[in-house]
Structure formats: structure tokens, C-alpha cells
Amino acid sequence: MSTEPLSINPLSAKPLSATQEPSTSSKPSRREQRAAAQRFIETLQGTAFPNSKRIYLTGSRDDIGVPMREIQLSPTLLGGSKDDPQYEPNEPIPVYDTSGPYGDPAAQPDVHVGLAKLRANWIAERHDTEALSGVSSDFTQQRMADAGLDHLRFEHLPRPLRAKAGKRVTQLHYARQGMITPEMEFIAIRENMGRERIRGEVLRQQHPGQSFGALLPENITPEFVRQEVAAGRAIIPSNINHPESEPMIIGRNFLVKVNANIGNSAVTSSIEEEVEKLVWSTRWGADTVMDLSTGRYIHETREWILRNSPVPIGTVPIYQALEKVNGVAENLNWEMFRDTLLEQAEQGVDYFTIHAGVLLRYVPMTAKRLTGIVSRGGSIMAKWCLSHHKESFLYEHFREICEICAAYDVALSLGDGLRPGSIQDANDEAQFAELHTLGELTKIAWEYDVQVMIEGPGHVPMQMIRRNMTEELEHCHEAPFYTLGPLTTDIAPGYDHFTSGIGAAMIGWFGCAMLCYVTPKEHLGLPNKEDVKQGLITYKIAAHAADLAKGHPGAQIRDNAMSKARFEFRWEDQFNLALDPQTARAYHDETLPQESGKVAHFCSMCGPKFCSMKISQEVRDYAAKQETEAKPIEIGMAEMSQEFRSRGSELYHSATSLQAEESK
């Protein structure tokens, strides 16, 4: 077997060892996984979902073009004859799209070059930033000077920006000054989801929701966005060094958002695979992505991700800081952590998770817990506090952290280091003590015009979930809440995307602004590409269910379009309206693979004779034809019953036999 080494240039056009023998196992080898990821990104091009097209809704200026996906629908057959059928068109359905250029068939993304700098002019025209002559971080300087890393480095590194002396460049600062930024206008258009384009009365129908105090205007304006940001109820993660990102907002008075976690570890994954996961995540609806890398080449991996990400990127800086001290938590210090913040801020990280609420006096509160401290960042800081017997440097230097964030517009995601790791530990003293401290830190961050959101649990049974939301709103001053699930039971490893999706839907309804996805691999291993998709689909369902329950304007349009297509047996439209068209189509075709199955007025669940919707259609048609009010449904049902008996007692009919019968 060849001993030719793996191509060491990540993402290079040169393929990985062409002579490498494929693995004979059912599970791909590490080499095969990396090769597959490289092929994916080397052949990457803008791709739309089936029967969808990319549209751009324009704003008040030429450089505001908000991407949407528009799902094209087939017409409804009204009647007529075989030779002269009568159809009624169905209007296309616009939907929120996070995929950036990767979802535009006209785009030709090149990961080696990175995405276009959408926000560069907006940032420049505010005249409050300056390009640095070099990087500020000592660690970054060391990496740049290491020629041995040239083969890993993103080639087109931009010069970092920073606020001019005496200036603050955060969206919160602008909002408080009464300024409506292009980012805010972009967001207002995006949040409305093009629903003003929908004319059909059937599609616009919606049940009233229960918003639990959320304010959901019928039309979201740029001024409303500004007001919500100024009040601290919403954030726009938008580092000035990540101009490639498309503006989005996180707040309970907006659509519920979903975050996807990616990142390498000490034992698995490569730069290629993480870039692939990024693109994959945005395709399946990730509103933000957190890079939680803990393995080798964290700095270089993050650069590739940022330069190719159309969504905000978050990190947990303490993870990288710990790598710099070889995993010894006691050796962490403020100087090293500060340097890590500068490193990541100048790369373009949009929000930092900071576990500044883990105080020394709170650690003993966890002693009687069933599962102790399960947050990685929380356990690191707890160990540091106990080792030094003092408050953490994150807490002691929090104002300095805010100064750094204000200079780059990095939002703070105040981490819940003492979140419960089992339902038994939910809502305990330690959890809420930390939450109250996070509320105090929120006010400090706001003094520096730094945007803030609050992280939440975790593992919480259903009956205890709402208290988490009410406590956060009260003690954290309505700052956006961002939760991991919560998981509602602990008995389902391998299915924790389900157990947590239940809790996510509930807390999203109660007011949580962003849900951090959980994949099937939670508690078991690092997720792969398919796990990422499963987690995202589950959480997009949870977020959408929460929007419906809150009564978010226009949230029901897609549901109504799906129901109409289902009732009219427009199978292709049903597939295309689904969150996951590929899976919907595949499941249908398992039992009805013929093309005739795509037009049949039944599916394999009930067959043609017991399809409730087909029966209902026939009853409706009969009532209309009779033009009588003499209980048409009962009469129709009786006649349908007689017709079914006359056709025989078979439960299932083939698609071909049904079509033959209908053509008579």
C-alpha cells in the first residue's frame, strides 16, 4: 500500500492521495472523511432547494439586498375536462434563508478567497474605525511568524479594524444615538419574510398566539429594530472584522433563532471538515454558528470559517486559552485571556461566551448535585477559583472585557457555567445565583454599549421550564435568552435532539430568543455532517412551533400552503414546502416510487379508499353540486359509504388501477 502522505494544504485544489486504498469498513476512515470534505468544498457552488429560487428584497439603498428563498408551487386543478383542464395558480412562498451565497445558484463561492464583504462600505462610511498596521495579539503575531503554518493559513488575510480612539462601534451604541444603520434596515426586511407579497386570504389566515408579554408588531420597521436594540431586548451580532456576515437579530420580539455548534477536537475533525460543516449548517437553517474547536490549529480553522461564513460566528475563548496552557486550568491568567480576546476579535468573532458569573462562593452550592458542574467553561473557571481561592479573572476584569468588545462590536453571551446537567439538578440554588450575577454583569456591559445575551440550561423537566424564562426576564432586564434545549428527560442518549427539542419549543414560546441545537450525538461523541443536519431540522421545527404559538405575524403562511397542497394532493409541492424536501420525497418514494404516485390522490398510509382527504374532497364537491343546505355532509358520507362497498373491500389499491378508474 502506498505510503504517500496526506496532502497537507487544507482545502487545496490538489486532491488527497489518489492512491490511498478505500476503507473496507462500513464507517469511513479519518482519511476518507477528510477527503470527502475536501471534495465537497472544492466542488462547492450555489445550490437552491428543489423548485426554489433565490430572490433579493431591496431596501432604501442599492447595497441593501436581503436574500430570501422563494418556493415555486404548481397550480391547483379546479376541474374542466381531460382535454381542457382548468387550473388556478398558487403564489410562491417566500421563506427566511440563512445559506448566503451557498444558496444562490448564480453565485460561485470560492472558499480560498472567501465571501464578498457585504458590510464593508457600511462600516467604512461611519468613519469611526481604523485599519491597524498589524495584529494586536501576541499569539497571532507568533502564528504569523511561523512559516511552518503557511500551508494551513487562509491566504487572503484582511487588515483588522478597530474603533478609533474615543469611539464605540457597536450596534447598541448607534441605536442609543438614534441612528438607523443599514444593518437595522436589512434586518427589518428580513424579519418580515416577504409576507407583504402574499395575497391569498387562505394563506394569510392565522390563529392568535399567546405571547407571554412579547411585543409582535404586524410589520417590523427599521425603527422598531433600533428601539429593541437600544433597549437591550435584542442584539445584532456584527463584528466590524466580519463584514461577510448578513445582518440578523436575536430577541424575543423577533423570529426565534437557532444556533449550530461545530468545531474540531483533540481526536477528530480537520479544517476541511469544519468548513464543510459551516456550509452545511447554513444550508439547513443555522442563524448563527459557534466554533467550539479544542484541537490543533484552532486559530487557523477559525480564520477559514470566518472568511466563509454568511452568519455570525460565536466562540468560547476560554477553550483556546486553556489549549495555550496545555489544558492546566490553574495556569490560566488574565493576560493570556486578554490576548485571546484580541486575537479572536480581530479575526472577526461576533460573540463571545464568557463564564464570568461562576463565583467562588457559588461553587460549594454544586456539591450536593447529582451531576455537579457539567459546563466545560464553568468547570474550568470553578477549578481556577478553587485553586487560587479568589474570584475568577473573568469577573474581576469584566470591565476590561467590555472595553475590548466595544472596540470591535463583539457581543457578549454570558455563559451559564452552573447550568444543570440533569433534570434532578434543575432550577437549583447554584443555577439561579449565577443567573442573578449575569444580570448584574449585563448592566455593566451596557455601560460600555456592549450588546448582551444570556445563556440558559440545560436539563429541565417540562413543568419547570417557564420559571427559567421568568427569572431571566426579571433579573437580566429582558436581555435576550439563549438556551441549550433544555432537555426534558435524561433517558434517551442517541435521541437527545428529541428530548431537547421539546424543551426548546416550550422555552421559545415563553420568550427565549435563540435555541442552541442538540444533535443525536449529544453526550456520546462529536457530531458529523448528518448529525448537524438532524439537530438543525429538529430545532428549526422547535423554533417555528414557538413562533406559531407566540403568534408571530406571518408564521403560519408556510403551514397553510403545505395544508392546501396536502388537501389537493400536490405531492411535489408538499415535498418542496417541507423543511427537509429530500427526506420527505424519499419517504414517499419508498412505497410509491412510480411517477404516477406523485399525482395519486392517496398515499400508502391509508390507500385510495380510506384517504380522509380524498373522501373530504368528494363530500365537499357533492355539497357544492347539490347546492343544498340539507345536511350535505351526512348525505355525502352515506353515498360515499355505498360507493366504497360497491367497489369491493380491498384496503389498498395500486396507483395505476386508481388512475384507470378515474379515467373512465
Curated annotation (Swiss-Prot):
A GO biological process held by the record: thiamine biosynthetic process
Cofactors, names only: [4Fe-4S] cluster
Cofactor binding note of this UniProt entry: Binds 1 [4Fe-4S] cluster per subunit. The cluster is coordinated with 3 cysteines and an exchangeable S-adenosyl-L-methionine.
Pfam family, one: ThiC_Rad_SAM
InterPro entries: ThiC, ThiC-associated_dom, ThiC/Bza_core_dom, ThiC/BzaA/B
E.C. number(s) listed in UniProt: 4.1.99.17
Entry binding sites for substrate: N261, M290, Y319, H355, S375, R376, G377, D416, G417, L418, R419, E455, Y482
Listed pathway(s): Cofactor biosynthesis; thiamine diphosphate biosynthesis
Subunit structure as annotated in this protein's UniProt entry: Homodimer.
Protein name, as recorded: Phosphomethylpyrimidine synthase
Organism, scientific name: Pectobacterium atrosepticum (strain SCRI 1043 / ATCC BAA-672)
Lineage, broadest ranks: Bacteria, Pseudomonadati, Pseudomonadota, Gammaproteobacteria, Enterobacterales
